[in-house]
Structure formats: structure tokens, C-alpha cells
Amino acid sequence: MVPDGWKNQSPTSLFKLFSGFAFKSTDAQESGTKWLKIANVGIGEIKWDADSFLPEHFLLEHKKFALSKGDIVVALTRPTLGNKLKVARLTKESDTSLLNQRVAKIVCKDDGDSEFVFQLLRSDEFAYRINVGLLGTDPPNLSVKVLEDFTVGCPPLPEQRKIAKILSTWDKAIATTEKLIEASKQQKKALMQQLLTGKKRLINPETGKAFEGEWEEVKLGDVCSKVTDGAHHSPQSVEVGYPMFSVKDMRSTGFFENTARHISDGDFKALVKQNCKPEINDILIAKDGSILKYCFVVKEEVQGVILSSIALLRPKLNKIFPQFIAQYFSQDSVKFFVGKALTSGSGVPRIILKDFKGIHIRIPSVPEQQKIASVLTAADQEIEMLEAKLAHFKQEKKALMQQLLTGKRRVTVDIDI
């Protein structure tokens, strides 16, 4: 049923596609005017991580293909990723560029508000309709014909503008939170570089002064009673039983049991005897595949066992504070070193445990380790809080889009007096 005052129309009643120009690869330069290609169009964002440039004078010679801040572009070839359309808006003055083939500019008609159209294009329902229209095509290409094969609810322009204003407010909140997350991550990286190397010493709460004393260089195997991994064989799965965790079940602070397969009581007990059950204060590390992607400390009893894709460190608590080591192995520089120097496997890369045991690390006293870990853990918690806030904002906006873009929820349009 069409909401009162709305019309069911083809998306082409709101906008048209203006395709880019077939610039030659031989025209490319090291600098000049940005060249917007299909690879630059992401889900809701323009990505300039792979910049290409054309001569400056092309802006005048091909001015009808010039893009500027505020323009909306969409990928024409393979236009969707999952249930999202590759559509984005140029948001900066520095986004000024020339439009390449296989990308189109969205040109709104008199019946379409540009911000409303942008929100419509970003909705899951719109991407779904595009995917349906492209079924069986190879390669899938977005065209006017595809757009003419389905209809969307089109409210009057004043209502379009009000809907767009509401959804744009959520976009701003999402963008602000994303920037805060990125800033917090950069701040934490800077803290890690200072605290985990001893360049910056924290205050010892017992003395009220900065920690003192030289840091000690040790081998990982000397400060851990175990440096091992989980089971090297995989028992038969059962419907109801104990979880058997692998790398795919790891998350930043623990296991996600919903993805784990389960094994029988007998197999579980046998693997417990083989020391495949983590204990409190153990440090678990992604050993195979996504090396060091996850590294966390076991904080409560785990009623499950681990496979060999997970490494287990059991620290000597008089030498090592577990959270300090977990933070140490989460450094990008350490991940890079381990990935390059301590792995094997032409297919799936794996940490070589005998080499891993011999890795040298510099550690301060346990009290200083605890203080460093507490500061970095607080930074992690701040990031986690912001990420939870971001997820909430995105979910709220998604629910609003489903209501507002279908007319299930109507808005009050401001009337000029």
C-alpha cells in the first residue's frame, strides 16, 4: 500500500545516471587532477588510497566529467558488495576529480532531493532490488534498464528533505564517532610506543615518583612455564557437548562460542589431560592464519579446549603480568616481526613455537608492568565503548531508514509562514 501523498515510481523519476569518460591509461601522471575510478568508490565513502592522476588541463577539456564536493557517484560494474550499493558522496574540496568510465554521477531530477536520493541509494532494500535485477548477468552492470524494472516509494519534495535531514543527522553522529575511534586508536598506539619501550615511565603509586630501574631482557620461554598450542587432532563433532575453539572463534577479549563446534564429554576429558584446556591468566594467541590478530588473557574459567591454531602462553606470575604481555604482542611492530621472522608455511602461515619461545623481550618490574597494562587496558576500554556506541548509532539509523524510506513512519514537514 502506497503511503498517502507518495507515489510508486521508477528510481529514474528521481535521478539519472551520467557515465564517466574512457580516459586512456597512457594519460596517467604522477600528479595533477585526481582521476576517480571504480576502485575509488566504496560503501558510502570515496577511497583515495590508490590515487591516480590526469593532466591538470583535462579539467577544462573534459569539464562535463568534472566532479566536485557534494557530487554523488555509483559504481556501474559489480555495483554491490553483499547487500550494499557502492555509492558515495564527495565530501571535501580536495575530492575534485574527473569521472572515469564504469562509474556514474547521480544527477537528480526536479522530483528528487539529492540528499534523499543518496539515503535511498544506501538503503539495504535498494541494494537488494539492484541485486535481483542483476541476477544471471556476468559481469553485472548497473544500467537505466535495471533501474526501470522496479519502483520505489517517492514522497513529495518537502517530505524528502525532512527525511534526508533526519538521516543526515545520524550520519554526522556516526562520522563523528568514527573519527573519535580513529583518534583513540592513534593515541593508544603512541602510548604503546612510549610505555612498552620504557621511553616514558609512569608514576609508582607506592612512592609517588616515576618508576626507576633498568628493564631486563628475557626470552619468552624463560618467563613462561608453557609456550605451546592446542590439540593437533580434531575429534568428531557432536550436537551437544563441550566447545572446541579455533582461531575463527577468537575475538579481541575472548571466545565467541556460537561459532565453535562441539565435542563429546569423553573427547573433552582426553584433551584436558593433554593440557589443551586454558587456565585463568593464560595468554591465548592466534597462531595459524591470522597471526597475532587476536591476543587475550583468560580471565575466567573456560569450559572448552583449543585446537593447534591457537598458541597458549602460561606466564610465571612472579616474572610476568599477563596483560602486559598481551599488550606487547598487540603492537604492530611485533606483529610484523613475528609474521616475517617466526612463521612457516607456504599456504597458511604458522608461528613456529620453538622459535617463538626464543623471542627476546624487555620487561620492567612486575609492579611497573601492572601499571603499564592498566593504562593501556583503560585505552582499550575507551575504544570498545566508542565502538559499541558506533554500532548502536548504525543500528538505529538502519531501523530509521527502513521506516522513513518506506513511509511506515511519517515525518512532520515544516511549513514556511
Report residues per predicted region.
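A short glycine-rich beta-alpha junction/loop motif
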Residues: D4-K7, D95-A104, G112-E115, D124, ...
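Non-catalytic DNA-recognition/assembly elements of restriction-modification systems
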Residues: M1-G20, D149-L157, T207-D229, G358
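Short coil/turn segments at secondary-structure boundaries
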Residues: K24-S31, V132-L134, H233-V240, E257-A260, ...
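Amphipathic alpha-helical coiled-coil/heptad-repeat segments
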Residues: M1-G5, C154-A210, R362-I417
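A short beta-sheet element
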Residues: K37, D51, F58-R122, S246-V247, ...
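A structural connector/turn signal
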Residues: E61-H62, T137, D149, A210, ...
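Sequence-specific dsDNA recognition surfaces
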Residues: S10-S25, V41-I72, G221-P235, D249-I280, ...
